[in-house]
């Protein structure tokens, strides 16, 4: 699963979309400005704006997701490479089972051995993020076939998450500098991979807590971080 650790948190409260006059024109501009500046807006109003923004954006997000997926399947070196290697070891991932859809959960996508790959159009912000997420999920698909991953085994889960975040480009150094600045420059790549792997493993029903997830990730770190198959090295 590809987690979106740096996007706005999803609101779990039950909200309804505001009236049409609040979703366009001057009123929408005013609400957008309040949200961006944090001035004159309550926490409840922030949650309502986030809900309205997602509802207002859904049709375009789904259209963009499908268009960007088509582009990546034809032109992205990492996606084409991973699709080819999944196919070589018996996988059946294709455009027919890579689906753009709306997700309630706070994630960018997911992989299921029988269902294929899900891309969460309402959380994906641009073409290049979709490329990272799709590559991430294709690494999971490869691992399930190549290494017989069993997600009830936390070490298996940790290893495939380490590899997926490492090989997908999600933790490329310039992304991390944008998020966290220049501090600990030499450790940013590894820190990002560990953070994402721990977050994913901690959500596993068989994991007791974050401390256990961190322990498992550290246990398998050396072998999994050094395994770049099917790539020769980390390119992205």
UniProtKB/Swiss-Prot annotation:
This enzyme's EC code(s): 3.4.24.-
Entry function: Has a dual role in the assembly of mitochondrial ATPase. Acts as a protease that removes N-terminal residues of mitochondrial ATPase CF(0) subunit 6 at the intermembrane space side. Also involved in the correct assembly of the membrane-embedded ATPase CF(0) particle, probably mediating association of subunit 6 with the subunit 9 ring.
Keyword Transport recorded: no
Domain of life assignment: Eukaryota
Protein name as catalogued: Mitochondrial inner membrane protease ATP23
Gene: ATP23
Active site: 137
Keyword annotations of the record: Hydrolase, Membrane, Metal-binding, Metalloprotease, Mitochondrion, Mitochondrion inner membrane, Protease
Topological relation to the membrane, as annotated: Peripheral membrane protein
Cell compartment(s), UniProt: Mitochondrion inner membrane
Any one GO biological process: mitochondrial protein processing
Family, per entry: Belongs to the peptidase M76 family.
GO terms under cellular component: mitochondrial inner membrane
Residues that coordinate or bind a divalent metal cation: 136, 140
The keyword ATP-binding belongs to this UniProt entry's keyword annotation: no
One example GO MF annotation: metalloendopeptidase activity
Organism: Debaryomyces hansenii (strain ATCC 36239 / CBS 767 / BCRC 21394 / JCM 1990 / NBRC 0083 / IGC 2968) (Yeast)
InterPro entries: Peptidase_M76_ATP23
């Amino acid at each position: 699963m590809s987690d979106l650790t740096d996007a706005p948190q999803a609101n779990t409260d039950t909200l309804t979309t505001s009236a049409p006059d609040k979703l366009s024109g001057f009123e929408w501009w005013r609400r957008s400005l309040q949200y961006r500046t944090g001035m004159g807006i309550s926490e409840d109003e922030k949650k309502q704006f986030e809900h309205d923004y997602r509802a207002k954006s859904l049709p375009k997000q789904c259209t963009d997701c499908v268009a960007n997926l088509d582009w990546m399947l034809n032109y992205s070196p990492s996606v084409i490479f991973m699709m080819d290697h999944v196919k070589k070891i018996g996988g059946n991932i294709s455009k027919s089972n890579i689906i753009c859809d709306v997700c309630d959960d706070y994630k960018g996508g997911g992989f299921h051995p029988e269902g294929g790959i899900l891309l969460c159009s309402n959380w994906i912000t641009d073409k290049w993020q979709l490329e990272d997420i799709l590559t991430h999920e294709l690494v999971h698909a490869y691992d399930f076939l190549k290494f017989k991953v069993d997600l009830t085994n936390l070490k298996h889960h940790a290893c495939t998450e380490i590899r997926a975040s490492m090989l997908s480009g999600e933790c490329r150094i310039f992304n991390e500098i944008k998020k966290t600045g220049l501090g600990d420059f030499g450790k940013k790549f590894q820190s990002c991979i560990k953070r994402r792997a721990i977050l994913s493993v901690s959500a596993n029903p068989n994991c007791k807590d974050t401390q256990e997830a961190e322990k498992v990730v550290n246990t398998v770190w050396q072998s999994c971080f050094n395994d770049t198959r099917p790539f020769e090295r980390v390119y992205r």
